[in-house]
Design a protein with these regions (language model features):
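N-terminal lobe/hinge region of extracytoplasmic solute-binding protein
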Residues: 55, 59-74, 83-140, 171, ...
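Surface-exposed binding/hinge segments that line
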Residues: 184-231, 248, 253-255
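Bacterial signal peptide processing site
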Residues: 27-29
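Short, well-ordered beta-strand elements
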Residues: 82-92, 134, 144-147, 166-170, ...
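Extracellular/periplasmic solute-recognition and catalytic clefts
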Residues: 176, 180, 193-196, 252-263, ...
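Aromatic- and charge-enriched surface segment that lines or borders ligand/interaction sites
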Residues: 134-179, 197, 203, 296-298
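Gly/Pro-rich hinge or "lid" segments in bacterial periplasmic/extracellular proteins
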Residues: 109, 115-116, 122-127, 218-284, ...
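C-terminal motif of bacterial Sec signal peptides marking the signal peptidase cleavage site
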Residues: 22-25
């Protein structure tokens, strides 16, 4: 199966499925709004995580770099920006984590939809198109893909996206501390390693030669500077933290048991790129808990 999270416009009709899935509501006191910036604790103090060492290796294979700016656009220049998109939840998500206990809810797609991958798939032609990587190449062993990152790519807290964030993804997904056996197994059995050549060049190596490597190796980054070294407090510590992302929207406000609000970034690094232009047009998206189906359809 593919681990590629195919980026779609976050607010397509697909997300209407959210109203059909009942989550268990949180028991926090109503009436208290919690707004926590990415990288900060609930008390408003910024964490200073210990960062794992970054190891680089020389790139020894000569490859043919590929890119794709020839696919038809699937957005309209006439699209009007602004406004608020409103969606309903039958109950509030149990966590903002996307891995670990209670994370496998339908609301998770709203968070993952704002985390880009190395490459994307064109929705009409099904050809590879750039996302965080501008170029890619295939190794002769038929199990390695090479990538060149867009130097402009940034996390939502302004930190540059680097090859180290993709190597960190492998360590993160294999960690026992995230309490996610499926991810532990997949990232061990399917991906052998991530090689870092420099800040913007890397290789992702599969455990075996296989067709359609791009569907398996076009992984997403994990913000190394945000998490640092993991420990057994991961599940509780990051339950409600807003993790930096690379996509066009970020959680801006939430009240447990009531609502979650997303806001479009004013200066998103990818807004003028060919396959991102004229998309992601609403300014805000609000998910509101409506527990009564009759009220929901009124």
């Amino acid at each position: 199966m593919s681990i590629k999270k195919r980026l779609t416009i976050l607010f397509t009709p697909i997300l209407t499925g959210l109203i059909l899935t009942a989550l268990i509501a949180c028991g926090d006191k109503p009436g208290t709004t919690e707004k926590t910036a990415a990288g900060e604790t609930a008390a408003g103090q910024r964490d200073t995580p210990v960062l794992p060492e970054v190891k680089t290796v020389p790139m020894t294979e000569e490859v043919t770099w590929l890119t794709n700016d020839a696919e038809p656009l699937f957005s309209s220049p006439d699209a009007v920006k602004g406004g608020t998109f409103r969606e309903a939840l039958l109950s509030f998500p149990l966590t903002f984590r996307t891995v670990g206990p209670d994370s496998n809810s339908s609301f998770r797609s709203a968070i993952l939809g704002n985390q880009l991958s190395l490459i994307g798939i064109h929705p009409n032609t099904e050809q590879i198109i750039p996302e965080l990587a501008t170029h890619w190449a295939y190794g002769k062993d038929k199990k390695t893909m090479y990538f060149k990152l867009n130097p402009a790519a940034r996390w939502s807290d302004g930190v540059p996206v680097t090859a180290a964030d993709f190597a960190y993804s492998l360590d993160f997904m294999r960690s026992k501390y995230i309490v996610a056996p499926w991810y532990n197994d997949y990232y061990t059995q399917e991906i052998e390693r991530v090689d870092i050549f420099d800040d913007h060049t890397l290789a992702v190596v599969s455990t075996k030669a296989q067709p359609d490597l791009h569907l398996r190796l076009g992984i997403s980054p994990t913000p190394r500077h945000f998490y640092g070294q993991l420990d057994d407090e991961f599940v509780q510590k990051y339950n409600w933290k807003i993790v930096p992302n690379t996509g066009p929207y970020q959680i801006s406000d939430f009240q447990k048991g009531k609502f979650v609000k997303f806001k479009r970034k004013k200066e998103w690094w990818g807004q003028d790129l060919r396959y991102f232009k004229h998309r992601f047009n609403v300014d805000r998206v609000t998910y509101t808990v409506v527990r009564d189906m009759n009220v929901l359809w009124e």
